[in-house]
Amino acid sequence: YPFVMSVDVASDSFMQTAEMLLEKKATLTIWQGVIPLRYVTGVVAGFGMQENNGWQMRYHLRIEPPLWRCGLRQNFRIFQQQDIRTISATLLNENGVTEWTPLFYEDHPAREFCVQYGESDLAFLSRLWAEEGLFFFERFAADSPEQKLTLCDDVAGLSQAGEFPFNPDTSAGAETECVSMFRYEAHVRPSSVQSQDYTFKVPDWPGMYEQQGENLNGQLEQYEIFDYPGRYKDEQHGKDFTLYQMESLRSDAEKATGQSN
């Protein structure tokens, strides 16, 4: 999921019950003094009653995004001649995920057929999104609790973070936003992907596609992943799926991490 929040709350109401709160919308507001800095909205997925000191009752809430609901349903289902946008819309809307948007920079052609075989809706969607080179995140509004699940296929769809000064001295409180730690890592990962599939409509179609990894940083080039069947029936899907699989396998070949205030 994009996030999971475990929240302890105090209330002067002693009468809150699971029936009143489970699956209700909840918003956590993060304040700096009297200024709200951020809002995170989700669905109450868990409820617990804790201490009662006579004047206040403590409760525990587990808050998850609406996408969490997709993990509670399992099905056997066939989608024919539908693209990833249509399949996603069907399953997300059926699970009550209404605040979402596709942000696609590439073509995602319709699939001849696509089978959900005993998977949860979330596992099925996650598999399809990975095959189509999609990632997802919650896009938060800057000044309101509004947020929207976003499906995206290119980093161009992410918001720019801007520029921040680097200040490794964490002993004193910085008055401005700054980065206090930055690290870079490189790892050996698979160097290429070769995939193949078959269609009875064109028995002699080779159906084989290959994608080489980029930025190998001196590693050996012998680490090939061969995937059969590649879960495609045409050239466009074959090329795209092979590329997306290569990008996924090397997604952490180079990684940067940081900390800020």
Predicted regions and their residues:
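Amphipathic alpha-helical and helix-coil boundary elements used as assembly
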Residues: Y1-N261
